[in-house]
Amino acid sequence: MTTFLGKHSEADDHIAQLRWLGHDVRVVSGGHDKEGVLDAFATGLELPDWFGRNWDALVDALRDLDARHGVPIELVWDHAATLREQDRRAYDTVVEILEQVADERDDLYVTVITR
């Protein structure tokens, strides 16, 4: 499941509520182009060294993302507005990847915040 929040939503409250519910909240911040967003995911999710910084590698890394403590993972992609405005194709690709992997996994939920 993917939740989309805009710049006028209570994004910080949403993240706090997910933490309160006991979800394993992992925040990825920003990215203004393909390279930047792949770097943001690598850093924000502490992806392994084999992560090749391409779309296929992102899919593989998200599929392999370990759930800590057996609780659901809530992947929050925050500050996604810049990529959406500067490179809509890359933004759409990231959203498609996130939705695809979330559909494949029972323990992964996604929030995209475009602020």
Q: Where does each model-flagged region fall?
A:
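Positively charged, polar, low-complexity stretches
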Residues: M1-R115
